[in-house]
């Protein structure tokens, strides 16, 4: 594929920025929020949408557009902004659909729990053996385990799998509490399978392309131990089931009527991660990702649009 001449890049960037402005104005004129929506609800949605927009811009400017010869300005402290924007997008989406209390519980408990699990697993080899992180992983470390690992699990695994599983299993953004424990256990298992599917792309990229950590032992699958994926299924099934119990215990509920702008945030993030991993061009990884990430994402989009088509018009 031919590269764009250097002299044409500023013009292309200018066209890109004009397109972004035009898109934002179009969204505004189409009334992103219902007219009767309270200001607080609008603010929560706006922050969530803005956060995912920043995340997508970073992914495009860093991973995808350079392959096409288009180079956009990089943000300062981009690795930190990327993690921060993903975390904010996840938190505000949870806030809108599950309430502030449950959103805070998810952010704090999931981030802390998975950091501890990563620390123990890395040192004790709980699933698949021990591993050690390198300086390529962004952010500071404590005891050899990066601080941002907990937030990464929260935004990139827990958040995306939670909403996608609800859509795939029940065709809704938030599952019904009826017969909750049977349904919750099944949805939690599907969520863990989605997490495993994400990690089947994420780990090969982070280990082989980004060199962010090294396994003491591996397997023929890009050097990632198979036990690592078994661990994801077991741990995430239990954790997501426990979170659904806490939702019931603390009466989680939506702030208002479902709005597509905030409902599509987890799917946008999921698809963006697929593109990011696929852009590394590791042999065979994109084919794997088409089944483990792209297919569930497409099915979830279809279920999401079907869900909104059934909703009554909002004034």
Predicted regions and their residues:
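Intrinsic-disorder-associated, low-complexity terminal segments enriched in Asp/Asn/His/Tyr and depleted
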Residues: 8, 14-17, 28
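Aromatic-rich, lipid-facing transmembrane alpha helices and their immediate juxtamembrane interface loops
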Residues: 24-315
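Non-catalytic, largely sequence-independent nucleic-acid-binding elements associated
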Residues: 20
